[in-house]
Amino acid sequence: MGTLTTSLVVPSKLNNEQQSSIFIHKTRRKCKKNQSIVPVARLFGPAIFEASKLKVLFLGVDEEKHPGKLPRTYTLTHSDITSKLTLAISQTINNSQLQGWYNRLQRDEVVAEWKKVKGKMSLHVHCHISGGHFMLDLFARLRNYIFCKELPVVLKAFVHGDENLLRNYPELQEALVWVYFHSNIQEFNKVECWGPLRDATSPSSSSGGVGGVKSTSFTSNSNKKWELPKPCEEACACCFPPVSVMPWLSSNLDGVGEENGTIQQGLQEQQS
């Protein structure tokens, strides 16, 4: 995922070694008077998934067990030092990845869980936009942009890391992806449907939306197909797990959830 800071300005003409760096902080001492100066930052470049930079950990789960029978979650974190991603696949969120002052300050992790609701599988992805400390609030709009831009990369990491599961159960590629943006700012506190997993891993070719992703608001009554799944109120066999494996989301974040009446829904439109 992209870092939350931008780089310094540098000359537009760089040698090959300099161009290979994502963030460049050095400038030439001698520059021509008319040489143009441009900002260089991966933040505004394309979101690209690199499998070689992904480390996958299976913690207490069967690589091929259907998530409709055994809880399955994803915890994805990014290192700004190594630029590598770590994906933990387990029955509950891997809290050890989220420890430490730096992780609590950045809050750039993405967590997700598979759910079966009334017999249909769906993937529920959670991102923390703001809330917790003032720095996150100050850069809420930028963080929202980055998460939207990088989410296709995140979803590709899930698909690549859990490829055996998806190979054995290809129907999971048709499962809807619901993205929860948690924020103490109403504008960014929302839920969006990014469509089937197979489509959500590809950013829209349209440049009209945030990060190349064009979303439009809709009401649950306008299209039943995209209605946010609601589990049965009583014990049943068609919903699993019976309770979310992420109870901390509702207790620690004053954000998304039907219980507080602040849900906003959106639908990602994939443009061909």
Swiss-Prot record:
Native species: Solanum lycopersicum (Tomato)
Chief localisation class: plastid
Protein name (Swiss-Prot/TrEMBL): Protein STAY-GREEN 1, chloroplastic
Protein function: Required to trigger chlorophyll degradation during leaf senescence and fruit ripening. Binds directly PSY1 to regulate the accumulation of lycopene and beta-carotene in the maturing fruits.
Keyword set, alphabetical order: Chloroplast, Plastid, Transit peptide
Protein family according to the UniProt entry: Belongs to the staygreen family.
Quaternary structure and interacting proteins, as annotated: Interacts with PSY1.
GO cellular component: chloroplast
Additional remark text: Plants silencing SGR1 exhibit a stay-green leaf phenotype during leaf senescence, and a red-brown fruit phenotype in mature fruit. Plants silencing SGR1 exhibit altered development of fruit pericarp cells.
